[in-house]
Amino acid sequence: MEKSWFNSMLSKGEVEYRCGLSKSMDSLGPIENTSISEDPVINDPDKNIYNSIWGESSSYYSNVDHLVGAKDIRNFISDDTFLVRDSNRDSYSIYFDIENNNFEIDNDHSFLSELESFFYSYRNSSYMNNRSKSDDPHYDPYMYDTKYSWTNHINSCIDSYLRSQICIDSSILSGSDNYNDSYIYNYICSESGKSSESENSNIRTNTNRSDLTIKESSNDLDITQKYRHLWVQCENCYGLNYKKFLKSKMNICEQCGYYLKMSSSDRIELLVDPGTWNPMDENMVSLDPIEFHSEEEPYKDRIDSYQRKTGLTEAVQTGTGQLNGIPIALGVMDFQFMGGSMGSVVGEKITRLIEYATNEFLPLIIVCASGGARMQEGSLSLMQMAKISSALYDYQSNKKLFYVSILTSPTTGGVTASFGMLGDIIIAEPNAYIAFAGKRVIEQTLNKTVPEGSQAAEYLFHKGLFDSIVPRNPLKGVLSELFQLHGFFPLNQNSIK
């Protein structure tokens, strides 16, 4: 990727040339012809810019002017870098990359001498010394008069260029003591020839320091909200992941590898063989048993809104299926439904699943993702902990069957204190948040700071809280081997319905 440090246009009658200075170029030459492609200067890359443009006495070129029209700004700054100076003679490398939504500003002095040499050669050329300034309709005093310093000239050039191309505020790079804050407005959003939407970048420039801080404007939020259905933002690196491809990547961030939350339906699809899933108790819903009073939103209305949002009736899906041909009983909690909280319906569905697995001698998997007991159901939600634990005791101790608990992020509260930690084999996902009381609750209750990472899966694994940390990719294979090790084998092909 070649980056142009400074771009200029020189005009000869009706012909316009675009030329650039690049750090990687041995000589300076024209890049493209924006109007006429037959010109020999453009088609001869071996000619030096001083011979092809400055040195020919028959050529008449005006001073450095602006490059392209505002309508071409999207193409021009799609991936360009150029050098600017502030009033303190501090140089900055400004890099635009609109396609990847990058805007970078860095100090860079390595190219300064080359840039100065270029303009000094132009200003001190014999052509400039012999011609009359008054005859030039495009005469720019900032370019030629010795009373203006190089600093003022470069400030003026960049200020004028940026203002004409991307609507820069008049105070930027002007060196004025009355203005410390400057704003660059990039008009980069357009839709099918309609009026373009503006995406604002707010840049604070302190004339007494060389540090620049990029701020986001309020319009960024509007654009994010408009296209949020297309992307999923990583909780760890804040990178954007295209939602269409995220499912095929098992909801793992492409940038940092962080494990994003998965819906219960996606987890069922990940673990269960296609066409073998048989859900249980789908129509079981909560009826607000204690008539919980809420000043904000009634409990029933909240349940209804989550049902519409997720397409589920409750915070857990239960059923039977096959995992690599092995019949299993599976329960998957969904954090998107009221934080995966465990109410009376969640507890009843899990209890019925365990009882069914006990009667059918099926291995059991429960995928945990919950914030704990549901406060809107009071003590009834707490009783689910004892009810599920009692059913598991009969399943594990009396029937000697095999239960695997999978802890995902987050697993907290009553779920951690009951069936989450009762598995014969306890598996955790990488970097999962696993705790009884959350960090905020502990700090507010004990008035002590919880060490960073003390509730992460990797730390708890070394303390012996569970048996293994298994990534999502090999999870199905690991479970299949565990089941076969404990005497659960795939069905014969002839017996598969």
From Swiss-Prot:
EC number from the UniProt entry: 2.1.3.15
Binding-site positions, Zn(2+): 234, 237, 253, 256
Cofactor: Zn(2+)
GO terms (BP aspect): fatty acid biosynthetic process; malonyl-CoA biosynthetic process
Molecular-function GO term, any one: acetyl-CoA carboxylase activity
Function: Component of the acetyl coenzyme A carboxylase (ACC) complex. Biotin carboxylase (BC) catalyzes the carboxylation of biotin on its carrier protein (BCCP) and then the CO(2) group is transferred by the transcarboxylase to acetyl-CoA to form malonyl-CoA.
Record-level GO cellular component terms: acetyl-CoA carboxylase complex; chloroplast stroma
Keywords: ATP-binding, Chloroplast, Fatty acid biosynthesis, Fatty acid metabolism, Lipid biosynthesis, Lipid metabolism, Metal-binding, Nucleotide-binding, Plastid, Transferase, Zinc, Zinc-finger
Catalytic reactions of this protein: N(6)-carboxybiotinyl-L-lysyl-[protein] + acetyl-CoA = N(6)-biotinyl-L-lysyl-[protein] + malonyl-CoA
Disulfide bridge map: none
Pathway annotation: Lipid metabolism; malonyl-CoA biosynthesis; malonyl-CoA from acetyl-CoA: step 1/1
Zinc finger residue ranges, C4-type: 234-256
Family: Belongs to the AccD/PCCB family.
Cofactor binding annotation: Binds 1 zinc ion per subunit.
Top-level class of the enzyme under EC nomenclature: transferase
Gene responsible for this protein: accD
Protein name as annotated: Acetyl-coenzyme A carboxylase carboxyl transferase subunit beta, chloroplastic
Localization per record: Plastid, Chloroplast stroma
Subunit architecture: Acetyl-CoA carboxylase is a heterohexamer composed of biotin carboxyl carrier protein, biotin carboxylase and 2 subunits each of ACCase subunit alpha and ACCase plastid-coded subunit beta (accD).
Domain CoA carboxyltransferase N-terminal: from-to ranges: 230-497
